[in-house]
From Swiss-Prot:
Protein name: UPF0291 protein SMU_447
Region (Disordered): 57-84
NCBIfam families assigned: PRK02539.1
Annotated keywords: Cytoplasm
Protein origin, superkingdom: Bacteria
Annotated organism of origin: Streptococcus mutans serotype c (strain ATCC 700610 / UA159)
Localization terms from the record: Cytoplasm
Cytoplasm among keywords: yes
Family: Belongs to the UPF0291 family.
GO cellular component: cytoplasm
Keyword Cytoplasm: yes
HAMAP family: UPF0291
Chief place where the protein resides: cytoplasm
């Protein structure tokens, strides 16, 4: 998310505390917050999907559900036709 939008979120939050928001400003704040949260979720999801969990012996112990997502996206050399 662009810094100008984050600044606007903060500006609206400050205004809400001091003098209140108009109806249009409330809608704008809600829209900007949703956009921010969606971007945050995408970032976290992308980070988690990139994880590979390895035990002390070097064995891949990544959960099956995560491996399947990685197979679909071709992450960590996993290919859709791989079964392990």
């Amino acid at each position: 998310m662009e810094q100008t939008k984050i600044d606007r979120i903060n500006e609206l939050a400050r205004k809400k505390k001091t003098e209140g928001l108009t109806g249009a400003e409330k809608l704008e704040q809600e829209r900007l917050r949703e956009e921010y949260i969606e971007g945050y979720r995408r970032s976290i999801r992308h980070h988690i999907e990139g994880l590979k969990i390895v035990d002390e012996e070097g064995n891949d112990i990544t959960p099956a559900k995560l491996k399947e997502i990685q197979r679909q996206k071709g992450i960590h050399g996993r290919k859709p036709e791989d079964n392990s």
